[in-house]
Amino acid sequence: MKPLTGTPMGEAVDSLPNRRSLAKLQTRQKVLAAARQMFAQQGYEGATIRDIATAAGMSTGAVFANFTDKSDLFCDIMNTDVESLVAAMEEAVAGETGVESALTTLFNAGYRFYQSQLPMARAAFSVAWTPDHGHVVRNLPSLRQLKAMITDQLEAGVARGELVSQAEIPLRTSMLFNIFLSNFPPAIFHGCAPEELEARARNQVRIVLAGALKA
């Protein structure tokens, strides 16, 4: 009897889940790319699941097989973007030894990161204050990371003796985070260049820290 040749049956069966997983991942990535394009072009409210499916060359069923709804899609994109933003900020601030300089550098890195993605930033602001999905966007894990970076810099300022021990760090973290966000609308709606945002942020950081600086 002639022995069988070729791929053993076990290996063939084992490879099937891998191929399925790869195909599912590729489909998911294709949907995300199409959704990013639609959100940037039409805004969050304007883009529909049908638009996204058409742009991806898929059925709406294929989109729903990967995401529960439009907000799920948008939050996935936003969380990925903010994770990349946090990484860019961490790289930018490495080596900074002064709290004011470090915070200004963090903010500047953020503005430059989004300079080429302002339509997505506009969509994010639109979703962030909707009653249905705003709380989800505002509480993304990556945004909590961003706030934690601000807290870390304030705590480092206290440890170095730049700031007083009673610096009300939670309050100042919240104020500085809101300041960081407040500079996006001038860029989105009025075309402010990164240099203008940086100058504005520098003054804002200085004012917020003024009451906590050691004499």
Q: Where do the model's predicted regions map?
A:
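Amphipathic alpha-helical packing segments from all-alpha helical-bundle domains
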Residues: E83-V86, S116, G134-R160, P170-S174, ...
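Key DNA-contact positions within bacterial/archaeal DNA-binding proteins
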Residues: G61
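Amphipathic alpha-helical segments used for helix-helix packing
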Residues: Q115-G134, P185-F189
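Hydrophobic alpha-helical connector segments
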Residues: D76, E90-P119, I169, T173-L176
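An amphipathic alpha-helix adjacent to DNA-recognition modules
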Residues: L25-A33, E45-G46, G57, A65-E90, ...
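Amphipathic C-terminal alpha-helical segment
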Residues: R112-S116, D152, A156, S174-E195, ...
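Basic, helix-initiating cap at the start of DNA-binding domains
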Residues: M1-Q42, I49-M58, D72
